[in-house]
């Protein structure tokens, strides 16, 4: 299976996403695989048997969101210089979303930009983080506030890597699949309601459909100037939750699941979404053991955290809210008291 992202503008940044077992990757320049110890221990041998390159280096970064920062980026860039990579060299991001974001950002700034390839190894990164060219690091003010749009040259999605994925991380990836269905495709949502993603064929279809939906949006709006903002459904709340908990309590997909439930509650209270549809979405998330509640200790403080998000512009909070399953609205007209009312409902879970 193959999905194509058409980004032919003044510079062709189009690329293919291959959703099949990796057969071979042939490269003609120095190449560095960037990974973490866990992925390397489980899958590096498998990947090395598929890659041909004149010079191949392995760079291992510490595992986890805590290390998605300037210090780790500097370490990675230093290793690229140590190995004498140049502007013709290629980086391979081999891991989950953190590795993909870090490697992509390093590729965007190393010698003013070099090519990179995404080989995502988690469900969440396969259906979301590896597609679309968003790269970056976190800082003390929030998530992904330092970064760049830098498209990969190709993405290889191989479900072989999911065989060793813990159940919790699998469920976190399902949250992003549900997100795509709720925002863009009612038929896909109904299909998800009826089918079990733990079955291999169902999982492959869900990955393909999610990637197709995201690819179509990225092709229309590469740099998030308009419709691509719809992909942030659930994320406005999720990023505050992650920031408040120091990125330790929830996986990203878990925070997004809670964020979707919060966004749905806001949509119900503003008359956009029916209570029945909100419950359908919540029930689907719970079927995969995803959290759907977060204890908001201080609604006013939570509200102020929205303004640290890069999606907030001119002191205005934009929300992506479903107005039906498969349809959405992007709005900046929600009043503070409406938001606070929703947050108060989450003071106790």
Swiss-Prot record:
Binding site for NAD(+): 63-68, 97-101, 121-122, 134, 143, 161-164
Pathway as given in its UniProt record: Metabolic intermediate biosynthesis; chorismate biosynthesis; chorismate from D-erythrose 4-phosphate and phosphoenolpyruvate: step 2/7
Cofactor needs: Co(2+); Zn(2+); NAD(+)
E.C. number(s) listed in UniProt: 4.2.3.4
Gene Ontology, cellular component aspect: cytoplasm
Major enzyme class: lyase
Matches recorded under CDD domains: DHQS
Cofactor binding note of this UniProt entry: Binds 1 divalent metal cation per subunit. Can use either Co(2+) or Zn(2+).
Reactions the enzyme catalyzes: 7-phospho-2-dehydro-3-deoxy-D-arabino-heptonate = 3-dehydroquinate + phosphate
Source taxon at top rank: Bacteria
Claim: Lyase is one of the keywords in the record: yes
PANTHER family: 3-DEHYDROQUINATE SYNTHASE, 3-DEHYDROQUINATE SYNTHASE, CHLOROPLASTIC
Alphabetized NCBIfam families for the sequence: aroB (TIGR01357)
Known role: Catalyzes the conversion of 3-deoxy-D-arabino-heptulosonate 7-phosphate (DAHP) to dehydroquinate (DHQ).
Protein name according to UniProt: 3-dehydroquinate synthase
Protein's organism: Nitratiruptor sp. (strain SB155-2)
Organism classification: Bacteria, Pseudomonadati, Campylobacterota, Epsilonproteobacteria, Nautiliales
């Amino acid at each position: 299976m193959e999905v194509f992202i058409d980004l032919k503008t003044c510079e062709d940044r189009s690329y293919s996403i291959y959703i099949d077992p990796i057969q071979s990757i042939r490269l003609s320049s120095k190449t560095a695989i960037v990974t973490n110890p866990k992925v390397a221990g489980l899958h590096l041998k498998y990947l090395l048997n598929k890659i041909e390159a004149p010079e191949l280096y392995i760079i291992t970064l510490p595992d986890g969101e805590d290390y998605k920062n300037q210090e780790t980026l500097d370490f990675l860039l230093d290793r690229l210089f140590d190995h004498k990579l140049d502007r013709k060299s290629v980086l391979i991001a081999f891991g989950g979303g953190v590795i993909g974001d870090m490697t992509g950002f390093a590729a965007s700034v190393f010698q003013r930009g070099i090519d990179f390839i995404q080989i995502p190894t988690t469900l969440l990164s396969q259906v979301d983080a590896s597609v679309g060219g968003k790269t970056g690091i976190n800082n003390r003010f929030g998530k992904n506030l330092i970064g760049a749009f830098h498209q990969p040259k190709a993405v290889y999605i191989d479900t072989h890597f999911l065989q060793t994925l813990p159940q919790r991380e699998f469920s976190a990836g399902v949250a992003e699949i549900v997100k795509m269905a709720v925002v863009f495709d009612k038929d896909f949502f109904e299909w998800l309601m009826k089918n079990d993603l733990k079955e291999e064929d169902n999982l492959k279809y869900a990955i393909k459909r999610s990637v197709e939906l995201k690819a179509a949006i990225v092709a229309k709006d590469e740099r998030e100037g308009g419709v691509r903002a719809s992909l942030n459904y659930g994320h406005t709340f999720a990023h505050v939750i992650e920031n408040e908990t120091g990125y330790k309590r929830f996986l990203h997909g878990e925070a997004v699941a809670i964020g979707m439930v919060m966004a749905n509650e806001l949509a119900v209270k503003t008359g956009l979404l029916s209570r029945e549809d909100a419950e359908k979405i919540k029930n689907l998330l719970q079927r995969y053991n995803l959290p759907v509640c977060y204890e908001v200790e201080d609604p006013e403080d939570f509200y102020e955290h929205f303004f640290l998000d890069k999606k907030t512009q001119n002191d205005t909070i934009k929300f992506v809210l479903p107005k039906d399953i498969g349809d959405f609205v992007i709005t900046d007209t929600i009043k503070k008291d409406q938001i606070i009312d929703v947050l108060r409902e989450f003071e106790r879970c």
